[in-house]
Regions:
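Generic enzyme active-site microenvironment
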Residues: 27, 31, 98, 123-124, ...
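Short glycine/serine/threonine-rich phosphate/pyrophosphate-binding segments
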Residues: 34-40, 104-108
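Active-site cofactor/cluster-binding pocket
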Residues: 77-136
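Short alpha-helices
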Residues: 124-194
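Short glycine-rich anion-binding loops that position phosphate/pyrophosphate groups of nucleotides
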Residues: 31-32, 101-104, 127-129, 247-248, ...
Length: 345
């Protein structure tokens, strides 16, 4: 099966970038999810495999607890905890690999550090409208995940034969999480061929699934139940749903990062629903609301994310951020739903 993504000129550029690099930084977006973390660590494992030993994986902030088992996770450097170390890594880098984000602003507080680096930049991503001021841009929004792209690149670089179980596990985790356990954006035959190739590397797919999706605390499950029971609003005639979550509610249930992961997908189980919106107060920044959108059944939420929520992402899975109160954010969400009422009806 044909997996190659790069033409001859591009693969030559990639080989040169890697062969000439000694100090490599790998970075991903703020609030790194399974795909961001999995692709970054998988790329690190591959680079180790080809003899690159001075690699720094730098994240803007914390990964969810359910990803801490990923092989190599203990090497991740958080900018919000160790800023000087991250700044030093970028300053000394002779190659910066940007994984799973399309715009510099997606690294949040780490943006200035990223942009101050004079090293050539390699972008590997599957989001729409990527920045292109890179030595090489590998952007494929049609792919299921950045992890899928990483697998394809490793294969094209003749790295599959020596791929470790650790690397394969990271790739599988990212592909799995970015497709909701292969329930959406995962209908191409190539995806299941790749899964077969990863299984041949002795990954334990059931264990990976359980570590990610069956890893909630009692408090997390009660928080999720509270939101669905008491906070979820459904506009039946417009096939839309939204909910708000305040800092106080999160504190009541002892919220930790990852407790609400994937919750925005749950309302999509309602028959005929086309749009689900999550509005959550940022626990660290005042008057900041984090927005997640999911869509299905022929409606695409990405334009709404860009128009109303200062965001973007994928056609059916997008995010954004509002600098306002949670009450104001709710009114913006209602306005957005009404704006697209003809498409939602």
């Amino acid at each position: 099966m044909e997996l190659n993504l790069l033409n001859q000129e591009e693969i030559a550029t990639l080989r040169n970038l890697l062969s000439n690099a000694t100090n490599i930084v790998i970075c991903a977006h703020k609030s790194p999810d399974g795909d961001a973390t999995g692709s970054s660590l998988a790329w690190m494992h591959y680079l180790n495999q080809i003899g690159k030993t001075n690699i720094k994986v730098c994240m803007p902030d914390a990964t969810p607890d359910f990803l801490h088992w990923l092989p190599g996770h203990n090497s991740v450097i958080r900018y919000d905890r160790r800023p000087k170390e991250v700044e030093k890594a970028f300053k000394e880098a002779d190659l910066v690999c940007c994984l799973d984000f399309n715009q510099n602003s997606r690294v949040d507080a780490m943006q200035e550090v990223l942009e101050s680096s004079t090293a050539p930049r390699l972008l590997i991503d599957h989001h729409l409208e990527p920045e292109t001021n890179n030595a090489l841009t590998v952007s494929h929004p049609e792919m299921s995940s950045t992890c899928e792209i990483v697998f394809r690149l490793i294969s094209q670089l003749d790295g599959y034969e020596k791929m470790t179980t650790q690397c394969a596990s990271c790739i599988y985790c990212g592909m799995m999480t970015d497709t909701g356990g292969f329930t959406y954006n995962s209908s191409r035959p190539e995806i299941f061929y790749i899964i077969g190739q990863l299984l041949a590397k002795n990954i334990d797919k059931d264990k990976i699934y359980n570590r990610v999706f069956h890893n909630y605390s009692t408090n997390a499950l009660r928080l999720r139940a509270h939101i669905i029971l008491n906070k979820m609003k459904v506009i039946e005639e417009l096939h839309a749903s939204y909910y708000t979550v305040t800092k106080e509610e999160m504190a009541q249930f002892h919220f930790i990062k990852g407790d609400m992961e994937g919750l925005v997908n749950i309302p999509q189980q309602i028959k005929g629903l086309k749009l689900s919106i999550s509005l959550r107060e940022d626990t660290e920044k005042p008057k900041t609301v984090l927005v997640s959108l999911r869509s299905c059944n022929g409606f695409h939420c990405q334009p709404m994310a860009a128009k109303f929520f200062n965001g973007g992402g994928h056609a059916d899975a997008s995010g954004g951020r509002l600098n306002c109160t949670i009450e104001e954010a709710e009114q913006i969400a209602i306005k957005a739903i009404l704006y697209y009422k003809e498409e939602l009806q």
